[in-house]
Amino acid sequence: MKKNHEKHADKKEAAKEELEKDLQPKDESAVKDEQGAGCGCETSKENPQEDKAEQNSSTGGKCEKNDDVLSPEKRIEELEAKCRDWQDQYLRKAADFENYRKRMIREKQEAIDYANSNLLLDLVQVLDDFDRAIDAGKTQGGESVNNAFVEGVVMIKNQMVSMLSSKYGLSYYPAKGEAFDPNLHEAVSMIQSPDVKEAVVGEELQKGYKLKERVIRHSKVMVLMPAEKQDEKKAEESEAADKKNEN
């Protein structure tokens, strides 16, 4: 009985020792190996230099990429190019606006200067009537009453011309004896003359007037033409008429 009890105690002791061995912590290296094997990762103790090289290469590649994207020199070049572009656009817009401003000022001044052109054109016809009255009084001649009448009409006409010139800028430009200019003269007739070498105004049939620098009524004139030029002009007119008929 006693022997059986001792055997049973020995078995208990052996089981207790085995359990304590199992519960003891494993070696740190073994634990790390098991953890590495469990997660499928390779241990870095065997080749630490290779791991460092790989890390350096990966970080170096990232740095190079960041340098390409955020390079200060390239960023400065881009900003300078944008500044030049904006400056060029600004200068162009400023020049356009300045031209627009000058054009508006000029058009406004022209509108002010020539606002009364239609009224003055009507008054020019009144001046024509004064000239006809003066010519009629001079042709009658003779009596002193007629001379006084003509002088009075001349005074009124001169006063009116002076007022229109000083206040509104209306002026008469003479045409007789001047070279023919289609911008100033309207040719009513042309006569061939051996005494002239170029087209000249031989007679003024109706006076021409300017409002400041603009012609508001062309003078109607008779033009003296040299023989050759008149023939050339007639030939040109006939050619133009033939072309119109052909079309």
From Swiss-Prot:
Keywords assigned: Chaperone, Cytoplasm, Stress response
Coiled-coil ranges per UniProt: none
GO biological process: protein folding
Pfam short name (any one): GrpE
Ranges of biased composition (kind: Basic and acidic residues): 7-35, 43-54, 228-247
Compartments it resides in: Cytoplasm
Residues covered by region (Disordered): 1-68, 226-247
Disulfide cysteine pairs (residue numbers): none
Cellular component, GO, one term: cytoplasm
PANTHER family: GRPE PROTEIN, GRPE PROTEIN HOMOLOG, MITOCHONDRIAL
Function comment: Participates actively in the response to hyperosmotic and heat shock by preventing the aggregation of stress-denatured proteins, in association with DnaK and GrpE. It is the nucleotide exchange factor for DnaK and may function as a thermosensor. Unfolded proteins bind initially to DnaJ; upon interaction with the DnaJ-bound protein, DnaK hydrolyzes its bound ATP, resulting in the formation of a stable complex. GrpE releases ADP from DnaK; ATP binding to DnaK triggers the release of the substrate protein, thus completing the reaction cycle.
Protein family (similarity comment): Belongs to the GrpE family.
HAMAP family: GrpE
Self-association state and partner proteins as the record states: Homodimer.
Name of the featured protein: Protein GrpE
Organism: Treponema denticola (strain ATCC 35405 / DSM 14222 / CIP 103919 / JCM 8153 / KCTC 15104)
Gene this protein is translated from: grpE
